[in-house]
Amino acid sequence: MGWAAEAIHRDGIQHRSKRRDLLEILIPYGLVLGVIWTPRPIQKWLWILAAAVVVLVTAISWPGLDAMGLRRKNFLRSLWIVGAAMAAATVAVALAGHLHTLYLHGGPLWLLENYWLYAIWSGAQQFLLQSFFLLRFMRVLPRKWMAALASAGLFSLAHMPSYILVPAALVWGFLACLLFLRYRNLYPLAMAHAILGITIAITIPGAVDHNMRVGLGYLHYSPRYHWHHPLWMRRSPQP
């Protein structure tokens, strides 16, 4: 009985109805899509509502820090994920430099000043993907890989209609979910997400990926409007 209780605590699996889990998936995700596809100023209030619902549902259904991957265990073992992201970023930056598409005007300090907000947003996205949606899909679907694929599918659809970010989000989302299931540590995945996202931002021209915007922001993107904004707003990925 002890090992069973430990497994339940680790995986965040509880005896509860699938209907409740589906509602906890569909309602927050519907609000996320509302934020993405709603114009301002309504978007601001929907964003607040969506964040509040996620926090409330997480608090009510609290699975524990270990289940959500907010722990020290396996952190060092999974740091290779960050190294792999850095290696991929190095190759992408070198290729962008060769193709003259690199948008990099400084060193680490410049990156920190321009992309610190996106780094935080990357962690929030990984929390939603793994600690929120994946845990619930694991209780709804019979196989873990199915839960990983379903979570990645939602993550990818939230990046519509960007033809660059949709496939990138699907691939990264699926791999990240599988890695989360293996190591159950969110921190390296959040760091890798930030690295890969910033790499896309500085290697692909804003006119091509619409400044990494999604939803209504992607459709309303204007290069002329883009260049009248400060540097950090022009090329920072947009939450």
Task: Outline where the language-model segments fall.
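Function-critical hydrophobic alpha-helical transmembrane segments in multi-pass membrane proteins
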Residues: 103-157, 161
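Juxtamembrane "helix-exit" motif on the non-cytosolic side of transmembrane helices
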Residues: 34-39, 93-104
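Hydrophobic core positions of alpha-helical segments in small-molecule transporters
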Residues: 81, 150-151, 191-192
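Interfacial transmembrane-helix boundary/kink motif in multi-pass membrane proteins
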Residues: 5-28, 48, 62-91, 106-114, ...
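Functionally important transmembrane alpha-helices
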Residues: 166-226, 230
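Membrane-embedded alpha-helical segments of multi-pass membrane proteins
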Residues: 45-53, 111-116, 120, 124, ...
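N-terminal, membrane-interfacial amphipathic/helix-forming hydrophobic leader that caps
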Residues: 1-65, 201-239
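Membrane-interface starts of transmembrane alpha-helices
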Residues: 41-49, 113, 142-151, 185-188
